[in-house]
Curated annotation (Swiss-Prot):
GO biological process: tRNA modification
Record bears the keyword ATP-binding: yes
Recorded name of the encoding gene: miaA
Subunit structure: Monomer.
Origin species: Azorhizobium caulinodans (strain ATCC 43989 / DSM 5975 / JCM 20966 / LMG 6465 / NBRC 14845 / NCIMB 13405 / ORS 571)
Matches recorded under InterPro entries: Dimethylallyltransferase, IPT, P-loop_NTPase
Name under which the protein is recorded: tRNA dimethylallyltransferase
Site keyed Interaction with substrate tRNA: positions: T109, R131
Enzyme Commission identifier(s): 2.5.1.75
Recorded GO MF terms: ATP binding; tRNA dimethylallyltransferase activity
């Protein structure tokens, strides 16, 4: 049954979060087929057109089963901010609902879900020349020195950020250099959310830790068999600037080093698996602390829980 079959157009969306390799895509496909839904991506790597296999984007066959939005629509050379994703997701949800379909937002990027349901600070776009100036300044600096520099400009952000969190430290420095205001000050002026939490069904897919580790390892091996290495080779041939987000996709740095002859294939695979497992652990921690009131379930129970909540 689709949304056209009922005037009770609640919920406005279904949100499905979960760690990598937990089975989110399969769950979303099953739910979308039952609800005449549209799957909307909330994964910060799957927005890029490069590395379809390595980032575990849905296959072309899966995308033919139900409509998919915000997958592979951004070139790897481009910057893609949370603000841009919010704008794209809001448009995709509005289009789905205008068509009488249920928006099903699925992914593992916690910041996307938080911004969607709690609002986003109105930080201006950072000019490219400012970004490059900050990056050049940081090239020869260790991260703890950058963290100390941030403490003189934005003490509140420095307290909140780990001294080794180089990417977020650089982001905070860029905001200060571009706007003259601390990032923490911008964040206090958060806009109203695009989607109120109470208007959505919110679900976290959970998998037992050892089971998830095994799934991650097997999936990485399957990706290698499916052509992930060739994808990385094509991406490397583009010679993108080193700070492009897509170059940090889990497994890409290790496979790039293998292609350069700097490590063995077996070591590259092991490092890619380890990197992905560490990321999954961070995701699980995020979902536990940032989404305490979301529904939870396993791959065995999730579909029944969601369809029961939606009264299908």
């Amino acid at each position: 049954m689709g949304l056209r079959d009922s005037e009770a157009l609640k919920p406005l969306a279904v949100l499905i979060a979960g760690p990598t390799a937990s089975g989110k895509s399969a769950l979303a496909l099953d739910l979308a087929e039952r609800t005449d839904g549209v799957i909307i991506n909330a994964d910060s790597m799957q927005v890029y057109g490069d590395l379809r296999i390595l980032t575990a984007r849905p296959s072309p066959e899966e995308e033919m089963r139900v409509p998919h939005r915000l997958y592979g629509h951004v070139d790897g050379a481009a910057d893609y901010s949370v603000a841009r994703w919010i704008a794209d997701a809001a448009a995709a949800m509005a289009t789905a609902r205008a068509e009488g379909r249920l928006p099903i937002v699925i992914g593992g990027t916690g910041l996307y879900f938080r911004a969607l349901t709690r609002g986003l600070a109105p930080i201006p776009e950072i000019p490219e020349e400012v970004r490059q100036r900050v990056r050049r300044m940081a090239e020869d600096e260790v991260t703890v020195v950058l963290h100390a520099r941030l403490a003189t400009r934005d003490p509140e952000a420095a307290v909140r950020l780990q001294p080794q969190d180089r990417q977020r430290i650089l982001r905070a420095l860029e905001v200060f250099e571009a706007t003259g205001q601390p990032l923490s000050q911008w964040q206090r002026a958060t806009h109203r959310p695009v989607l109120e939490e109470a208007s959505a069904v919110r679900f976290v897919l959970e998998v037992e830790r050892e089971t998830l580790r095994g799934r991650i390892d097997r999936r990485f091996e399957t990706m290698m068999e499916a052509g992930a290495l060739a994808e990385v080779e094509r991406l490397a041939a583009r010679e993108l600037p080193a700070d492009r987000t897509i170059l940090k996709a889990h497994g890409a740095p290790a496979l790039t080093r293998y292609l350069r002859g700097e490590m063995s294939r077996a070591d590259a695979i092991a490092e890619g698996q380890n990197d992905t497992r560490r990321y999954a652990k961070r995701q699980v921690t995020w979902f536990r602390h940032q989404m305490p009131d979301w529904m939870r379930g396993t791959p065995d129970t999730a579909l029944d829980q969601l369809t029961g909540t939606l009264r299908l």
